[in-house]
Amino acid sequence: MLPWALTGLVQGKAITESLFKDVRRSSTDQKMQLPNRKLISQVSTATTYYVSATGNDRNGGRTTSSAFKTIQRAADLTKPGDTVMIMNGEYKNEPDRGTVLGIKRSGTAKAWIKFQAYPGHSPKIKHNTWSGISLADGVSYIEINGLEVIGNTASVTRAYALSQQYKLSNPLTNGNCILIDGRKRTVHHINILNNKVHNCPGGGIAVVAADYVKADNNTVFNTSWYSPYGNSGISFFLNADYDNNRGYKHFITNNRVYNNRQYIRTLSSKRISDGGGIIVDSSQGGKNGGYKGRTLIANNISYNNGGQGIIAHESNHVDIVNNTVYGNGQSPELSKVQLAAGYSNDVKIYNNIIHGFPGQQVNKNMRNKNVIYDYNLYPKGAVSVVGGIHDVVGDPQFINPSAGDFRLRSKSAAINKGYYWKDVKTDHAGKPRPANKFTIGAYQ
């Protein structure tokens, strides 16, 4: 996503399949201390609301048999510590609304507000508007867990999208699946966990001017196709500091991101420029100056995207560790680079399997400072422009990459050849990574 693309994220009145399924699920259950009566009172009065596609918004919403019909009805009642349990069914936007779920109420550090699938259920948020889920204007301490967000790409033809490429107020070709927008007031402490996000003509998970965002164990595919705003599967744009912490604050981990691509030319450049898997972009000069926190991009699988699999662009303090990128650069207008940093500073790129096309350039070093590539694996025939002395050239021996299975066979050249990265304790499937036997790539 490029700087000029911001206006396309929020417009109008309310503007704002996985091929191989892992069993690991992300969890952020808070272990609460109870030091005083005030906190005891807060915990004891936390409410669980229930939502069902067959419910009624005139119900009380506090039992499965008295569930609300819309998620928004429950969201508008939430207080710190509350949980919204969403049951099976399809939840769609009203014709005059810019989102299905607009989250406006915040939790606290010790009492997050959670929106999650009811156990054993698979609710679907379907929309043809600006976003399926939106969080904006300083919202904080929110968790979105286990939902499926589906856009309207299946009902939009490429011919129609081309006819609308200069009509920027059309949500049918510009809608995002999940939008976090902190440009007015910094949004912070948001967890996006275990969701399936797909078929949105704009971005998949789009994060703008936010801090402390965790995107973990999501599956993001078939997004970014029809918008002229330079979207990608997962994008963190204009990162903004909520505090002065210099450690890890943004986490993009354990996600599966594929088949995101741009078919409509980018507005300003009049060319295909984006449609990649994961991008951290333009964080050197946000609204509070350059972002000072670190971003960890780890254990992701990014493949068959139109643009690059993973890129840090005009961003500082990013660690890209133990990812698998494969077969990206599907758009013929773009290079075949799989993983790169450009115009960035203080970026470490370690332990990644970077698998592109024979004879094609797989990485790039574009006017960077203090960017280190090392302990990465490249297949034979790949053109590595920048590397490290501990790099491995060999066959990763994926089990079945054509089916999206990037686990490693026992003879893989990646096994036990990685660098110990203390903050990456498990792999993409939740398997522990032994300190003395770190394997390159998303799988241990």
Which ranges hold each PLM region?
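Surface beta-loop-beta hairpin patches that serve as ligand-binding interfaces in beta-rich domains
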Residues: 23, 29-36, 67, 409-444
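Residues in short coils/turns that link rungs of repeat/solenoid architectures in beta-rich domains
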Residues: 93, 151, 156, 199, ...
